[in-house]
Amino acid sequence: MEDATYGYKVPLLFIIISVLFVSAVVIIAPIVSSVHTIDEASFRIVVRSGLIYKLGEESPYTGHIVDTLESKIIKYDVVNGLKHGEFSISTLEGNFSVCGFVEKNKNVGSWKYFYDDGRLESVGSFIDDKPQGNWIWYYKSGKVKSEGNYLSGKAEGRWVKYDERGNMNLMIYYSNGEIVSEVKFSLPQFI
């Protein structure tokens, strides 16, 4: 995930996660994918009217789903046909890519995003599927890359970007997702 100073990665990553989920559930799962419950019983799932069902059953599914898609493992719980509870995407090697919570198919609470090697990339919260509150992004070194706040899914207030040495190099002020002002900082370059 990226901060609002880049203006695209938070919504882009959310879209990618949504597309991966929809692809797994709507397109791939009914055709070719096996989905497993905790007890390893295989079955196919389908989505009807926004609810998840076991193929051939009339009642919405409740249980745990583990699926694979494009070398990623997707795990989540389903209650009465809706994603509800822990949600994670991890690599085949076991490193998390994304982990968070879902209530009635909407992202809520704290979410963490990771680099492919398992190191933390960003952390923030969602309310009703929209980024909310303080979000922090990290370099692979673990140093803070940028931080800022969301209000109802839109960048709000002061956002700061740092270089890899920890020096502030950009400060942007947002109001309702729109840039109000921007200040760039530069340090003298020593040879």
Q: Can you say where each PLM-predicted feature lies in the sequence?
A:
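Periodic aromatic/glycine/histidine/acidic cluster detector
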Residues: 2-115, 119-139, 143-151, 156-161, ...
